[in-house]
């Protein structure tokens, strides 16, 4: 799991505390996915059976809860991308970009509505940093070209997903065209 800097929540060190932390996240995800989304520490305490001070120990605000969920899902997405890259074993950057776009689109669609939290500024930076390092290790393109390609991918997929709640095959194809056109020119 990538280390995140400047996060607003406190990751526990002890196993017992980690279980409480995970329970809070699980409950927060459940509430977030409800139709009448209103994520509050009071509701989490009520549903999870944990005391509010225990929750505030890890999450000083509602925003810190959302950030923790965002980081969790961003890390799951990054792990999935890395697994797909390893299983394919391509050294061709264009092919890796196509796989990257497909994996992100599938993850977003399969994990909605929680997946919209991947588009927080913090998560987008985490995604770009991790993928830049990964693609730089196998690519013959310069770092700036890859960095901007990742920005194109994230912007296109974010636009499509936030507008529609899913990503159509046409939007995936257009994202690939835009990114690959930039990359090769």
Indicate where each model-derived feature is located.
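Basic, helix-initiating cap at the start of DNA-binding domains
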Residues: 1-35, 43-47
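Karyopherin-beta/Importin-beta family HEAT-repeat alpha-solenoid scaffold
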Residues: 25, 42, 172, 181-185
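Helix-turn-helix
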Residues: 31-64, 68
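Alpha-helical DNA-contacting segments of helix-turn-helix folds
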Residues: 63-76, 118
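Hydrophobic alpha-helical connector segments
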Residues: 68, 82-109
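Amphipathic alpha-helical segments used for helix-helix packing
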Residues: 98-125, 155-159
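Amphipathic alpha-helical packing segments from all-alpha helical-bundle domains
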Residues: 119-147, 173, 177
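Amphipathic C-terminal alpha-helical segment
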Residues: 146, 150-169, 181-185
